């Protein structure tokens, strides 16, 4: 079967420090961080009391009270990001065949925030097991189930083709775009809204990561807490947000006169069958994902101009990822800039993969590599070029974005400049 070429024609982003792609790119290109003390609830009892929050008010972005009540925060993020992406693509969904349009969105924790809130209501703050269901909000089931993420976006834009929610932990955003890529490339749809959303800054989610000491306890210096690849790194900073890309059959995009940012040229995902949170030091599974994505893109590792790292800022992840990139790219790894935007916008779990892909598309559009903020002290086991603290101009033709998720998920996406230059 001939695989169709898949174009990226629109981007929408809701991220800490930057709602909308102009603000998001400004934050990244300036190397600023969005981490601060948690304001969404009182974090005093937590080990890690900091996060990268979105300055988000639903009504500021065209979401009415009914939508805000019906949808959890993460779905609100996705609706705003999808609307921006569709506008950016200059795509009139009313003129598209709804059966030839899809929506594939990812999330790691779904509506945990709303579920936690309602449990407090119905159980009188956890004091009773015979819960009072009269206290529950009428939209609770729709608000917390992960399926709502994709169905709400599909409903908003009249999408009647394949609609699916992907939940593969912290690779959900990459995998959602990867699955959408296959749907377009294989001719099942002509256009697909693809991305992810999560709003995990809630007491129970923060406590979960506190329990395994995965998050940074640098509460006295939030701006410098996330330090991917730095020798003094001590965990990630929780984030939140959403990003949606419009993926289209390249010929379909050309026929309607759309501007094209770039193409999705390769995708792969593998599991490590090893440990829920542990990673093999050698990085074999991530390297296999990279190699397979490169094969699909018909590229050698030496063609990659920039690697967007998972770069969570935990000791084991950053060593594992460095080893994987060196295994796949060989000596070229040492000449390839590799940075982590989690140093600036935190780790939004399932959403971060799509947010990072949006950053990659913008990096290609501007021909600028975003930096790794807060990188000051080299780690002998992490010995690549992590673009410390300042953005860097560079010719970007092919970009690799990689992700790693609890549960052993390892994914990679390759983006390539489209013929005729970039948007």
Swiss-Prot record:
Enzyme class at the top of the EC tree: transferase
Active site residues of this protein: 170, 310, 347
SMART domains: PKS_KS (SM00825)
GO molecular function: 3-oxoacyl-[acyl-carrier-protein] synthase activity
Catalytic activity, EC: 2.3.1.-
GO CC terms in record: cytosol
Role description: Involved in developmentally regulated synthesis of a compound biosynthetically related to polyketide antibiotics which is essential for spore color in Streptomyces coelicolor.
Protein's UniProt name: Putative polyketide beta-ketoacyl synthase 1
Annotated organism of origin: Streptomyces coelicolor (strain ATCC BAA-471 / A3(2) / M145)
């Amino acid at each position: 079967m001939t695989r169709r070429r898949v174009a990226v024609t629109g981007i929408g982003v809701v991220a800490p420090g930057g709602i909308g792609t102009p603000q998001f790119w400004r934050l990244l290109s300036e190397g600023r961080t969005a981490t601060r003390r948690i304001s969404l609830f009182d974090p005093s009892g937590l080990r890690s009391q900091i996060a990268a929050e979105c300055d988000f008010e639903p009504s500021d972005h065209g979401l009415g009270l009914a939508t805000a009540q019906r949808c959890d925060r993460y779905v609100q993020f996705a609706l705003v990001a999808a609307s921006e992406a569709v506008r950016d693509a200059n795509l009139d969904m009313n003129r598209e065949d709804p059966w030839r349009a899809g929506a594939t969105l990812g999330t790691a924790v779904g509506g945990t925030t709303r579920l936690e809130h309602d449990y407090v209501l119905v159980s009188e703050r956890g004091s009773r097991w015979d819960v009072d269901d009269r206290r529950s909000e009428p939209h609770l089931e729709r608000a917390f189930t992960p399926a709502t993420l994709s169905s709400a976006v599909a409903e908003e834009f009249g999408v009647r083709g394949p609609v699916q929610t992907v939940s593969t932990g912290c690779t959900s955003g990459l995998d959602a775009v990867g699955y959408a890529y296959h749907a377009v490339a294989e001719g099942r749809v002509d256009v697909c809204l693809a991305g992810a959303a999560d709003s995990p800054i809630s007491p129970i989610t923060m406590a979960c990561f506190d329990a395994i000491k995965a998050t940074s306890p640098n509460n006295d210096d939030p701006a410098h807490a996330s330090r991917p690849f730095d020798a003094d790194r001590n965990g990630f900073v929780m984030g939140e947000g959403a990003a949606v890309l419009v993926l289209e059959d390249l010929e379909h995009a050309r026929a309607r006169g759309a501007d094209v940012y770039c193409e999705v040229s390769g995708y792969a995902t593998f599991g490590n069958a090893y440990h829920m949170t542990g990673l093999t030091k050698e990085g074999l599974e991530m390297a296999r994902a990279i190699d397979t994505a490169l094969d699909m893109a018909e590229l050698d590792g030496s063609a990659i101009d920039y690697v967007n790292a998972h770069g969570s800022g935990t000791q084991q992840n950053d060593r594992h990822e460095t080893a994987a990139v060196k295994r796949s790219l060989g000596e070229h790894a040492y000449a390839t800039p590799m940075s982590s935007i989690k140093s600036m916008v935190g780790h939004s779990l399932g959403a971060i993969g799509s947010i990072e892909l949006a950053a990659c598309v913008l990096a290609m559009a501007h021909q600028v590599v975003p930096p790794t903020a807060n990188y000051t002290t080299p780690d002998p086991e992490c010995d690549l070029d992590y673009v410390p603290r300042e953005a860097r101009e560079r010719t970007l033709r092919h970009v690799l974005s990689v992700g790693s998720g609890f549960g052993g998920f390892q994914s990679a996406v390759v983006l390539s400049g489209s013929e005729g230059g970039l948007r």
